[in-house]
Amino acid sequence: ELQDEGMTAVFPYLEGKTRAELLGEILTAQGADAEVSAIRAAMDEIYSIRPEERKPFAVTPEFIKVFNALGELDSYRDKETENGGGWASLGAVLADESCSASNIDALFENMLVTADGTYAIDYEWVFLFPVPAGFVKYRTLVYFYRRYKSLLGGQAEREFIGQFPEYVKADEKLLSLYEAMERGFQEYVHGENQRTYQEDYMVKTKTLA
């Protein structure tokens, strides 16, 4: 609910468990085989996107600014032409669908499962420019793996991801590119841009008893 002429957002208090917690309980109680099925069901729930909100991915200046903050994607930049170097090579490797809005932090730990349904509780990093859908799903799987890898029987990260080819292509070049994009995103969030972001959007907060 918006108040104060749209300057204040008030959210209801929600009770439940995160999807990560519920998946962790399944992993602990039933093992990795049951976990794979549960993860698939959770991914299908999160990424059930209406067809009209999907479109082909295309590289944009905004995409480069966020995901190439470290310059690791420069090797995919095309040679200079009379119109300037383009990113067709990068777009070819990342060829995928994208959504009209991409919540980069659509992680299992950011999905609260309540009696009334599942709610996204962290949407600070929602981008309105095209982002490869596979990369967003990759982050969901990778962050779950990193949290629970001690319970996954010694599986390597890519081995774990390889169990879900319907969400993330098991392609070494693509996965390496996703890793570079993740490092670029972290630099964008926590590097020099973080100070600017905080200064631009800093607001006073008040805790209500």
Regions found by a protein language model. Give the residues of each.
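Hydrophobic transmembrane alpha-helix bundles
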Residues: D33-A42, A95-C99, H190-D200
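Conserved structural core of kinase catalytic domains
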Residues: L2-G85
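Catalytic activation segment of kinase domains across protein kinase-like and atypical kinase folds
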Residues: S89-G153
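Short, Lys/Arg-enriched charge-dense amphipathic segments
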Residues: R19-L27, S75-G91, A101-D105, L112, ...
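Hydrophobic transmembrane helix bundles of membrane-integrated enzymes that assemble
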Residues: N83-W87, M111, G117, R158-Q163
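Short, exposed beta-strand/loop patches in secreted or surface proteins that constitute
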Residues: E1-L2, M111
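Helical subdomain adjoining the active site within ATP-dependent kinase catalytic cores
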Residues: F129-R139, F144-A209
